[in-house]
Regions:
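Cell-envelope/extracellular polymer assembly enzymes that use nucleotide-activated donors
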Residues: 8-10, 43, 185
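Short, well-formed alpha-helical segments that are part of the catalytic scaffolds
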Residues: 18-33
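Short alpha-helix within the catalytic core of nucleotide-sugar-dependent glycosyltransferases
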Residues: 26-27, 82, 90, 103-115
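Flexible acidic/His/Gly-enriched loops in nucleotide-sugar-dependent glycosyltransferase catalytic domains
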Residues: 33, 63-64, 79, 107-170, ...
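Short aromatic/hydrophobic "clamp" motif used to bind/position activated sugar donors
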Residues: 93
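Conserved nucleotide-sugar donor-binding catalytic segment
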Residues: 143-221
Length: 255
C-alpha cells in the first residue's frame, strides 16, 4: 500500500522578467491543492531574481499560501532557488521554472509514489511528446550509472519532488557562476550521497522550450559543465574514478 504524507509542499519558482507567468503559477498551484490529499497544504514561493521589476507582495489565494521574495540584486537561477528553499516551510520541495507546467494531479501523485525515497520523478512532456521512449527508457536512465556516464536524464527540475532534508549541502553551498548545469549538479550530488529516486509512471509535468533557453547555448553549457566538474572535484563528491567518468561524459556530450 502506498504511503500518504501530510507534510506541506513548497513549490519554489525563480521569477525573472516573468510577471506575466504569475497568474498561471497561482492557478496551477491552486489546482494541485484541490487535487491533493495532504492536509498541510501547498505554499508557492515566488523568488524574484529581477531587481528592476518588483512583484506585488499582497498577492493572495484562498487555498494556498503565497510568499513573495523580492530582490535588490540578480543572483541567478540556482541562488534564487536556494533563497526560496531557505524561506520554505515545506517538508517537500519542487523547483519549478516559471514557464513550465504542473498537471493538477502532480502533488498528489508524486507524494503517493514517494514511499521512503528521497525524490519522486515523474514522466513528462517535452516539445509536445513524451520525453522518455524506447531510445530513452525511463526505468534505465534515472540512475546513478546513467547520470555519471551518459548525461542528465531529467529534462527540468520541476519534474522532481524532493524531500527537503535530502537536498545536498554541496549544492546549496556552491553557487554556480554559469547557469545551465546547476540541476545536473543537484542530481549528481544526490546520487553520490545515496539518494533514492522513486519512479512515477504518471505524466504530470510539461517542459516549455523557448529559442532562448539557456540549455540551448552550447558554449554556455560547456562552461557550466566544466564548472560543475570543478565543484564535484573540489568537494570530493566522487572518487577519482567517478570524476574521470563524469569528465569524459561531459566532453562526449558536447563533442
Amino acid at each position: 500500500m502506498e504511503k500518504t504524507y501530510n507534510g506541506r509542499v513548497s513549490i519554489i519558482v525563480p521569477i525573472y522578467q516573468g510577471k506575466k507567468y504569475i497568474p498561471k503559477l497561482i492557478k496551477m498551484a491552486e489546482m494541485c491543492q484541490e487535487k491533493a490529499q495532504n492536509q498541510q497544504g501547498i505554499e508557492l514561493i515566488l523568488s524574484n531574481d529581477d531587481p528592476h521589476e518588483k512583484i506585488e507582495e499582497s498577492l493572495f489565494s484562498d487555498t494556498i499560501t503565497i510568499h513573495i521574495l523580492n530582490t535588490e540584486i540578480n543572483r541567478g537561477i540556482q541562488a534564487a532557488r536556494i533563497r526560496g528553499l531557505e524561506a520554505a516551510n515545506g517538508d517537500f520541495v519542487v523547483f519549478l521554472d516559471q514557464d513550465d507546467i504542473l498537471y493538477p494531479d502532480y502533488i498528489n501523485s508524486q507524494l503517493s509514489h514517494l514511499g521512503d525515497a528521497d525524490t519522486a520523478v515523474c514522466r513528462c512532456i517535452h516539445e509536445n511528446q513524451q520525453f522518455y521512449n524506447a531510445d530513452r527508457k525511463f526505468e534505465e536512465v534515472i540512475s546513478k550509472g546513467y547520470m555519471m556516464q551518459k548525461g542528465n536524464p531529467i529534462i527540468s527540475a520541476g519534474q522532481v519532488l524532493i524531500r527537503r532534508t535530502s537536498v545536498p549541502k554541496v549544492w546549496t553551498e556552491n553557487i554556480m557562476k554559469t547557469n545551465c548545469a546547476d540541476d545536473y549538479l543537484l542530481w549528481l550530488c544526490m546520487t553520490a550521497q545515496g539518494a533514492k529516486f522513486a519512479l512515477n509512471q504518471d505524466i504530470l509535468f510539461e517542459h516549455v522550450v523557448h529559442g532562448n533557453n539557456l540549455s540551448l547555448d552550447s558554449r554556455r553549457e560547456l562552461s557550466s559543465l566544466e564548472e560543475m566538474c570543478d565543484i564535484l572535484s573540489q568537494n570530493s563528491v566522487f572518487d577519482e574514478r567517478g570524476m574521470k567518468q563524469i569528465r569524459s561524459m561531459c566532453q562526449h556530450v558536447l563533442s
